[in-house]
Amino acid sequence: MITKNEALDFLKLNSINSILEKLEGINTQNSSKTITFSKNAFIPVCNWCRNVCGYCTFRNENFKLLKMDEMKEILTKANAFGCREALFTFGENVDENEKVKEELKKMGYYGILEYLYEISAWCLENTNLLPHTNCGILSYDELEYLREVNASMGLMLENSSARLCSTIAHEKSPGKDPNLRIEMIENAGKLKIPFTTGILIGIGETLEERIDSIFEIKRIHEKYGHIQEVIVQNFRSKPLIPMENYKEPSPIEMFKMIILSKLILEGISIQVPPNLNRETGQLFLMAGIDDWGGVSPLTKDFVNPEAPWPDIEELNSFSKELGFELKERLPVYEKYISKEWLDKKVLEKIKK
């Protein structure tokens, strides 16, 4: 077990030998030498959001709300491509936008969650894809409602420090209050929803705040046992965002955070997005990641549209180069495929 003080000392190290010593413990954890990925389709249901984060390009005041037929067409194509995950994403509290609400009303829906539920249920009934929803803060009741049609759900913690709410990253983003995000992650645990969360590196946080965030995820998981994977995501600068000139975290910063995450979060998969780390992905594989996350042969990453997915053959090639076997997985990890963790209709779909 590593303490917070030991973790901080490790992040401050500039000795390659001392850093590599920590890898000995990592290498014994993934003795199977496998790295997983999920073949998915990214469905950006609506790109309006109440949050205006300093690093984001997803939000658009001139929003687009995908029509039901558009989503069904994407899902049908994804099914033909052999995808098994339908990633449904939209901005937080889109119902706050009267124009979005009016569009939904014209189509016969009282809100975005009813709309999402219907397309998710259609997805389960008509394709081999399993829904995974990531749409910002949801209440306990909303999570319970969506659990019926989701194999797993997700919300990035990003960081557990409230200090960032007064910085350029989150000063215009009420939904990035860490207390709200922690409450939702805990509620997902109470409801036994297999869950994905993660931290965002390079948005103005201190080393101590990075460590506190990982330990907060550990605390929640030890209480509820529902966190199946943790994403260690690096900030990437983009043109025309408020944080355009902010420095990106170095590969060594990421390398050390991955090692720490693997040591602290025992039994939880650690993921790094491969499209944000095409040049450094193999380095992070050496540091202990065991999952590449969702990769789509059909749709782009609408949150990071400037960063195309590597194709699966490319992922396979540089995984094999380090002796790892690339293995496809579902959006719900195998240990959560049971009636304890999944709604009956989702479980029946998987067993078919």
Swiss-Prot record:
GO MF entries: 4 iron, 4 sulfur cluster binding; 7,8-didemethyl-8-hydroxy-5-deazariboflavin synthase activity; iron ion binding; transferase activity, transferring alkyl or aryl (other than methyl) groups
Pathway(s) this gene product operates in, as recorded in its UniProt entry: Cofactor biosynthesis; coenzyme F0 biosynthesis
EC supergroup of this enzyme: lyase
SMART domains found in the cross-reference section: Elp3 (SM00729)
InterPro entries documented for this protein: Aldolase_TIM, CofG_family, Elp3/MiaA/NifB-like_rSAM, F420, rSAM
Record keywords, A-Z: 4Fe-4S, Iron, Iron-sulfur, Lyase, Metal-binding, S-adenosyl-L-methionine
Listed EC numbers: 4.3.1.32
Cystine residue pairs: none
Residue intervals of the Radical SAM core domain: 35-275
Protein role: Catalyzes the radical-mediated synthesis of 7,8-didemethyl-8-hydroxy-5-deazariboflavin from 5-amino-5-(4-hydroxybenzyl)-6-(D-ribitylimino)-5,6-dihydrouracil.
Family: Belongs to the radical SAM superfamily. CofG family.
Quaternary state and interactors: Consists of two subunits, CofG and CofH.
PANTHER family: 7,8-DIDEMETHYL-8-HYDROXY-5-DEAZARIBOFLAVIN SYNTHASE (PTHR43076:SF15), FO SYNTHASE (COFH) (PTHR43076)
Protein name as it appears in the record: 7,8-didemethyl-8-hydroxy-5-deazariboflavin synthase
Source organism per UniProt: Methanococcus maripaludis (strain C5 / ATCC BAA-1333)
